[in-house]
């Protein structure tokens, strides 16, 4: 795969910056694929990670639990009205897979097992598993797998950056909602 052979080697990060092996500085504008939104090398995070790894580095949540997961669960339930439980997974692709499974199982549980259509936004990258590629289809990344992905109902991203000149933002929002409603 020759197109993958000449990548820049990142050797460290500080705050919102990444540095390569030649000392060149890059703005980490996607928070290292949305996984490092607090910045690189923040002392309080490093210290917290060190403290936690001295107690427990990892434990499965399959028929087990652990103190940090329980603490976070209680905090999330406390700030999310109507939520009574949470489900943790270890990456975004798996989160998408589980979300799809939960949605399909919900409809089956209430007797509407024929409700299987999933609505998505165009170019909404969600990961690299087949389910995540299906709901987050980005042609540049996944076109070689398109025939293997399940179908979704795709909508254009309602981005006011491309606001038609003859519309107000409110009119544009209403038009985007109308497009969705008309598909169902």
Language-model-detected regions and their locations in the chain:
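Active-site-adjacent loop/helix segments that line or gate small-molecule/cofactor pockets in enzymes
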Residues: 1-17, 31, 55, 64, ...
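A generic secondary-structure signal marking the coil-to-beta-strand transition
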Residues: 6, 14-15, 25, 85, ...
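Electropositive phosphate-/nucleotide-binding environments in soluble metabolic enzymes
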Residues: 8-12, 39, 43, 66, ...
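A generic fold-level signal
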Residues: 10-13, 113, 147
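Conserved beta-strand and immediately adjacent loop positions that scaffold enzyme active sites
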Residues: 15-17, 85, 117, 169
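Short, acidic, Ser/Thr-enriched surface-loop or helix-capping motifs
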Residues: 20-21
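Glycine-rich loop-to-alpha-helix module at the N-terminal edge of alpha/beta enzyme cores
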Residues: 25-113, 119, 126
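PLP-dependent aminotransferase-class I/II
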Residues: 122-184
């Amino acid at each position: 795969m020759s197109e993958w052979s000449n990548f820049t080697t990142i050797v460290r990060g500080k705050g919102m910056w990444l540095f390569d092996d030649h000392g060149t500085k890059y703005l980490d504008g996607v928070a290292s694929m949305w996984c490092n939104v607090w910045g690189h090398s923040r002392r309080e995070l490093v210290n917290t990670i060190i403290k936690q790894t001295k107690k427990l580095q990892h434990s499965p949540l399959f028929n087990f639990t652990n103190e940090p997961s329980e603490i976070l669960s209680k905090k999330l339930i406390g700030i999310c009205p109507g939520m009574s439980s949470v489900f943790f997974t270890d990456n975004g692709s798996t989160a998408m897979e589980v979300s799809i499974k939960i949605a399909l199982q919900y409809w089956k549980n209430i007797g509407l097992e024929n409700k299987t259509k999933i609505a998505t936004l165009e170019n909404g990258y969600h990961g690299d598993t087949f389910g995540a590629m299906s709901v987050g289809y980005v042609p540049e990344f996944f076109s070689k797998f398109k025939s293997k992905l399940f179908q979704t109902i795709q909508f254009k991203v309602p981005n006011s950056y491309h606001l038609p000149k003859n519309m107000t933002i409110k009119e544009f929002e209403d038009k985007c909602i109308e497009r969705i409603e008309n598909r169902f």
